């Protein structure tokens, strides 16, 4: 959709983001546990990308709720069954944040509803956004962010769909929460303002990029960032820039972005990002 630029948009820059610095004595229990409900059979990659990216962005432990088989489970992720009972037990373990939707499928309405009614911070993506458009639940009190691409925006807004500026304000009005509208000219609602990502590159428009972004948001959020939405967008952008600079501007994949999260956070703390 068209951007619909407004003069009171704020540009995302290094000066406007915050990534929490971990103390040398920090342990995994202090860095926040994250639930990832996603990556069902045949879509395991989406859950893995989100979960591993959350770890690389600062999360201490990632509980991956998926019905996938054991051969598809990365050793860094703690696998649990995608049931309300298993999710309840995981939430009791110092959990602060949940990623809902990447590669999930549409057979988990009750589990999504349970998390929606919880006190966890939520990153809602992909099939989680489909649930939102179908069920139209009551607005939640706890913090959450939706991360739609253009097709998901159209499904959420239907006849109200227009330019990005109008879309982000309509989504907040209809559903509550905050929003990251992906694609060229990414818009972010955070701190009661609308933020614009000035960087755009067609290589970011490939499978899995949204899963990585959802993971980055959750990892930064769980580890203490007070601007997790725009910080995640900025960090993903910088990972892409670094890769494309080193590879003559081509061949970027979602896994490349995920692998560069750690180095880019390191550059941030060295004032080189």
Regions found by a protein language model. Give the residues of each.
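Small-residue (G/A/S/T)-rich helix-start motifs and N-terminal tracts that mark the onset
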Residues: 1-121, 130-145, 150, 154-273
